[in-house]
Structures are given as structure tokens and as C-alpha cells.
Curated annotation (Swiss-Prot):
Protein name, UniProt field: PTS system N-acetylglucosamine-specific EIICBA component
Compartments, record wording: Cell inner membrane
Residues annotated as catalytic: C412 (phosphocysteine intermediate), H571 (tele-phosphohistidine intermediate)
Membrane topology listed for this record: Multi-pass membrane protein
PROSITE patterns, per database record: PTS_EIIA_TYPE_1 (PS51093), PTS_EIIA_TYPE_1_HIS (PS00371), PTS_EIIB_TYPE_1 (PS51098), PTS_EIIB_TYPE_1_CYS (PS01035), PTS_EIIC_TYPE_1 (PS51103)
Enzyme class: transferase
EC number(s) from the headed UniProt entry: 2.7.1.193
GO biological process: one example: phosphoenolpyruvate-dependent sugar phosphotransferase system
Modified residues (Phosphohistidine): H571
Organism field: Klebsiella pneumoniae
Bilayer-spanning residue ranges: 16-36, 40-60, 70-90, 92-112, 132-152, 165-185, 192-212, 232-252, 264-284, 285-305, 308-328, 339-359
MF GO annotations: kinase activity; metal ion binding; N-acetylglucosamine transmembrane transporter activity; protein-N(pi)-phosphohistidine--N-acetyl-D-glucosamine phosphotransferase activity; protein-N(PI)-phosphohistidine-sugar phosphotransferase activity; protein-phosphocysteine-sugar phosphotransferase activity
Gene name tied to this protein: nagE
Listed NCBIfam families: EIIB_glc, PRK10255.1, PTBA, PTS-II-BC-nag
């Protein structure tokens, strides 16, 4: 993993423990005397902030492990206790704060990924597998304790000095932080910067003698000097960016305003209420980078002004109206937090006027002002149904180069974080037609697709679709529905079309209509048009002459590119990838040229019928959109290598 990919993944891992803070803040706030006056509720919220480093250790360990494992989370806690308790025996002054939790969480996650399946000798077998993970993590963290016991004190001094410099720099320091914070948003590295500012810099000791580090911790612990890294975000997120949204709406041609109005309104309301601004920011970041640079400068100015005015405000989640109301009467909030609203109104007009002028002056392609080809949004991109989500996930896989190019899938609140074989194969236009705000290509293997609040659900569905079978790359510039191939045309409708490919059945068995396949991706023809067969024999053959371009590692599916350019996917059974190759044996290797009827796979059909979810096997043309029609020829029983299955008609 390259360094940029590491920090991108770390940013995602930090999302889980950070997600706990809004709940803690609500409990802490509502338990205060001026609201519910229920101390045990306030203490419940305070407990989260008091043990934040431990929560980071558990959350990061779970997120970093390859399957969000509970044993990794336990190992994170074990590692944290071992390292922190051992370090202070070397130097009692050591305090790593949440960094200790992050480091031990990373160690625990890495140990799980490497040794969760370890086999030990019989007399130690009880400690093998996942039980080995907390033990090994504790050992490694003990070594880290010995190292950090001597290495960390100068680092701690440097952090303390750096924090003091930024704090002593006052308004200038907070302004620099705000500017850099926005510039790092496209890479996702802002989460790392935020963690240092919000959970590490600064120190406050309460009446009970408990020490708190970081702007957020100190603010909710009652430190009246906290908030310099938070206050200035409120005018930007609640007012400035909605002003930018209005400017982009009015800059769009009147005929296109209805198309972009709903989208801009929804992201503006989200920014105002919750402070989640990335969906709005990414609308103009990629289309008009100059505007984003202007936005970063204005954010720095806002933090500068807020600090210069002595405003101390804080948030548990982000600088939206909800957090503003919750923190307004907190002990740490300054008496002049109302000035943030005045600043907000000013920034609303500043953003509106500057964005309006710059968009028109440089003819920037903000939403609604793009070329006509960019206006097309596929139907499934607006679907909230389960089927629509599956189609959308399949389409994104195709847009990033298909399963051949997609190597790893992660997601955070607003973006898909993907590792690909070659970012040059990613179809930016196809992603935008699906509703993505933009695509960030961090390097040749690391990309981010900005999809908004549904990122995690889309990412999870993408993982499911990938396990079901291969998805071909999207065409270079498709002109309509990217994911769903047109239904097969009736024979009489294509009577004059030339047959470019004739396929024989690759399997002996019974024909099943594609719509009856117990898998939405195939049944909806998102993967391609074709037919399915329920096998009654063990041998799978090539349905046409061509090249076997891909055989999955588990040998349950293969892709054949015919001599005439048709891309045929033969997928044996549904969810058979979960069998990890059991029941399948490949008879040829990738890159082999084959003739129609030549054996490709051998199956243990008895085993598969007993263990697979279904052995109904789709045979689809993944690039069926390149042809005018697909004419089904087979029905009833078919014989592998002999019975004609379907014909593909040219345009």
C-alpha cells in the first residue's frame, strides 16, 4: 500500500470512533442543569470523552481489520492498555492522547489481517486463529511501549510547542488551519489533520484533576479557551456554502435550473443543518477548482475573524445548526457566539456575490452549465429501491473499469474509496452520469468517487455485486442507461440484421429465463443480456470460439472474448464464490484460445447442488449494448457444445 493509500484508508478508519461523538455530546448537553438537569445522563456523555483514546483504539482496530472483526476490536483495547500502562513506567509524563489509541488500533487491525487464521501446534491450538490476535497485539504493543517510552517525549514536546505556537499565533494560526483543512478535503487527509487539532493540541485540567487534550475534548470539558479550531466553521457551513449553492443555481441557464435545483437545495439544507458539506463542495471542486480555492481562502478568513473576535464555540459532529443550538449555552461557549450568525449572514452574501462573479467571468462549468452530454443521469441513479441500488452499484463497478480493474472497495460518509489496477481505465463521465459529483484520481491505483450520503450503502452493495460475478468495463462514452442493457429484441424486429455471433450452450441442463435467476444483478440484465442454464452435467465448455480472458480465482466463472468481439460471461451458480473454489476445477488457463465446445471447467455437481445457494448459471453478453439484439434460440433441455443457445445481431 502506498503512503497516500494508507492515509486515505486511515481517514476512513477514523470515521467510526468519531461517529460516537454526536451521541456523547447530546447526552452531555441534555444532562446539564439548564436543560434536563439529570447528572447521570451528563456523566454518560462525559464517559465517552473521558475514554476517547480507548474508543479510538477499538474503533480503528475494527475498521482496519479486513472484515470489521470483533476480535480485532478486543485486540485494540488490549494493545492500548498494554502500551499506555507500560510507557508511563519509563516516563510518567508521557501522554499520547488519542494517538495512542490510533496506533494500537492500527497494530491490532494489521495483526488480525495477518494472523487471524494462524494454525498452532495441537497443544497450543486453543490459542490459535482469532484468539491469537489479542495476544500478539499485546506483545507488539509492549515493544512499542519500550520504543515510545524514549522516543515519544521529544515528539510530545514538539507537538506541545507546535500547539503553543498555533495557539499563540491566535487568529493567524486558526486561519491557517481552516485554509489547510479545506485544501485536504479532496484527498480525505483532513481527517488526520482534524484528529491532531481537535483531539491532541492544547491541554486543560478540570477541577477533578482530569487532563483533556484537543479542541473538542477541552470545549466539552468546560475549557473557556477552546474552540479556535471550530468556531469559524459555523458561518461557512451554515451560511457561506448555501450562498454558493444559490449562486450556482442562478448561474445555470433557466431551462436547466429545475434539473439542478433539487440537488442544490438538498445539499445546501444538509450543510446548514448538519455541517456535512462535502456533497456540496464536490459539486464545484471538480467542475471549477478555482471556486474551491476561493472557498478554502474564505474558510481560513472566517476562522481568523472568529478567533480575532474572541468567539469560542464548538461542535461534536460538525458546524451545523443542530450543533450550534446544542452548544450555545455550554459553559465553554463564549457570550458572543451570537456573532457567528452575523458573520454567517455576511459570508452568505460574500459567497453568493463572489461565486456569481467568478462563475460568469471565467465561464465555469458549475452544475447546470456543463456541456449537454454531462446532463444525462441514468434512471437507476435516482432509485431508492433494492433493485435500483444493485443496478447502481453494478454500474459504478463498470464505470471504474469493471471487476478486472477494481481491486479494493472502501467507503466513508460521502465517497467511495477505491483501489484500481489503472486509474486511466476509470470512466469519469460514466460516474457523473450515475450521479457522482466527481472523481479524484490520487495516483495510478487510488481513486475516490464522490457519491454523497449513500456512499457506504453503495460501497457495501458493490462488494456484494463483485462476489456474484464479473462486471465488464463501461463503454468509453455510453449515451443512455449505463447499467441496464436493452431487453432482447423480438426476432421479427431484427430480421434484416446480420448475425455476428452464434453461441452454443456451455452446459448440459435445463434452460432458465434470465429474469428468473435468483440474483438481481443478472435478472435485471445489469451485467448483460442472455439466458441461464441449470446444469445436469459436470463439464463446462466454451460457448464460442475465442480467448478466455479471465477465470476467477475460485474457478466459478470465466469471461470469453469471442473472435468477433462479443464479451461472454459464464457464471456457474449464484454466490458460488463463497465456496472458495470448492467444487470447481479449471481445465484451461487465462489467455487460452479455445474453440466452441472445448472444456473450460469441471464441476463436482453433487457437492455444488448440496452447498451452493443455487446452481442456475447465467450465460450473458456483457457488452450487449454494442449490438442491436440478442435472439434466444434454446428452450427446454440443452447439451453442452451442441445446442444453439442464442444469436447476437449486429447494428
Amino acid at each position: 500500500m502506498n503512503i497516500l493509500g494508507f492515509f486515505q484508508r486511515l481517514g476512513r478508519a477514523l470515521q467510526l470512533p468519531i461517529a460516537v461523538l454526536p451521541v456523547a455530546a447530546l447526552l452531555l448537553r441534555f444532562g446539564q442543569p439548564d436543560l434536563l438537569n439529570v447528572p447521570f445522563i451528563a456523566q454518560a456523555g462525559g464517559a465517552i470523552f473521558d475514554n476517547l483514546a480507548l474508543i479510538f483504539a477499538i474503533g480503528v482496530a475494527s475498521s482496519w481489520s479486513k472484515d470489521n472483526a470483533g476480535s480485532a476490536a478486543l485486540a485494540g483495547a488490549v494493545g492500548y492498555f498494554v502500551m499506555t500502562k507500560a510507557m508511563v513506567t519509563i516516563n510518567p509524563e508521557i501522554n499520547m492522547g488519542v494517538l495512542a489509541g490510533i496506533i494500537t488500533g492500527l497494530v491490532a487491525g494489521a495483526v488480525y489481517n495477518r494472523w487471524a487464521g494462524i494454525k498452532l501446534p495441537d497443544f497450543l491450538s486453543f490459542f490459535g486463529g482469532k484468539r491469537f490476535v489479542p495476544i500478539a497485539t499485546g506483545f507488539f504493543c509492549l515493544i512499542l511501549a519500550a520504543i515510545f517510552g524514549y522516543v515519544w517525549p521529544p515528539v510530545q514536546h514538539a507537538i506541545h510547542s507546535g500547539g503553543e505556537w498555533i495557539v499563540s499565533a491566535g487568529a493567524l494560526g486558526s486561519g491557517i488551519f481552516g485554509f489547510i483543512n479545506r485544501l485536504l478535503i479532496p484527498t480525505g487527509l483532513h481527517q488526520v489533520l482534524n484528529t491532531i487539532a481537535w483531539f491532541q493540541i492544547g491541554e486543560f485540567t478540570n477541577a477533578a484533576g482530569t487532563v483533556f487534550h484537543g479542541d473538542i475534548n477541552r470545549f466539552y470539558a468546560g475549557d473557556g479557551t477552546a474552540g479556535m479550531f471550530m468556531s469559524g466553521f459555523f458561518p461557512i457551513m451554515m451560511f457561506g456554502l448555501p450562498g454558493a449553492a444559490l449562486a450556482m443555481y442562478l448561474a445555470a441557464p433557466k431551462a436547466r435550473r429545475p434539473m439542478v435545483g433539487g440537488m442544490l437545495l438538498s445539499v445546501a439544507i444538509t450543510a446548514f443543518l448538519t455541517g456535512v458539506t462535502e456533497p456540496l463542495e464536490f459539486l464545484f471542486l471538480f467542475l471549477a477548482p478555482l471556486l474551491y480555492l476561493l472557498h478554502a481562502v474564505l474558510t481560513g478568513i472566517s476562522l481568523f475573524i472568529a478567533t480575532a473576535l474572541g468567539i469560542h464555540a464548538g461542535f461534536s459532529f460538525s458546524a451545523g445548526a443542530i450543533d450550534y443550538v446544542l452548544m450555545y449555552s455550554l459553559p465553554a461557549a463564549s457570550k458572543n457566539v451570537w456573532m457567528l450568525l452575523v458573520m454567517g449572514v455576511v459570508f452568505f452574501f460574500v459567497y453568493f456575490l463572489l461565486f456569481s462573479a467568478v462563475i460568469r467571468m471565467f465561464n465555469l462549468k458549475t452544475p447546470g452549465r456543463e456541456d449537454k452530454a454531462a446532463d444525462v443521469v441514468t434512471e437507476e441513479a435516482n432509485s431508492n429501491t433494492e433493485e435500483g441500488l444493485t443496478q447502481l452499484a453494478t454500474s459504478y463497478i463498470a464505470a471504474v473499469g469493471g471487476t478486472d480493474n477494481l481491486k479494493a472497495i472502501d467507503a466513508c460518509i460521502t465517497r467511495l474509496r477505491l483501489t484500481v489496477g489503472d486509474s486511466a481505465k476509470v470512466n469519469d463521465a460514466a460516474c457523473k452520469r450515475l450521479g457522482a459529483s466527481g472523481v479524484v484520481k490520487l495516483n495510478k491505483q487510488t481513486i475516490q468517487v464522490i457519491v454523497g450520503a449513500k456512499a457506504e450503502s453503495i460501497g457495501d452493495e458493490m462488494k456484494k455485486v463483485v462476489t456474484r460475478g464479473p462486471v465488464a468495463a463501461a463503454a468509453a462514452a455510453p449515451a443512455g442507461n449505463v447499467a441496464t442493457a436493452a431487453p432482447a429484441a423480438k426476432p421479427q424486429a431484427v430480421a434484416n440484421a446480420k448475425t455476428v455471433e452464434s453461441l452454443v450452450s456451455p452446459i448440459t441442463g435445463d434452460v432458465v429465463a434470465l429474469e428468473q435467476v435468483p440474483d438481481e444483478a443478472f435478472a435485471s440484465k445489469a451485467v448483460g443480456d442472455g439466458i441461464a442454464v441449470k446444469p445436469t452435467d459436470n463439464i463446462v465448455v466454451a460457448p464460442a470460439a475465442g480467448t478466455v480472458v479471465k477465470i476467477f480465482n475460485t474457478n466459478h466463472a470465466f469471461c470469453l472474448e469471442t473472435n468477433n468481439g462479443a464479451e461472454i460471461v459464464v457464471h456457474m451458480g449464484i454466490d458460488t464464490v463463497a465456496l472458495e473454489g470448492k467444487g470447481f476445477k479449471r481445465l484451461v488457463e487465462e489467455g487460452t484460445d479455445v474453440k466452441a465446445g472445448e472444456p473450460i471447467l469441471e464441476m463436482d455437481l453433487d457437492f455444488l447442488n448440496a452447498n451452493a445457494r443455487s446452481m442456475i448459471s447465467p450465460v450473458v453478453c456483457s457488452n450487449s449494448d454494442d449490438y442491436s439484439a440478442l435472439v434466444i434460440l434454446a428452450s427446454g433441455k440443452v447439451v453442452a457444445g451442441q445446442t444453439p443457445l442464442y444469436e447476437i445481431k449486429g447494428k
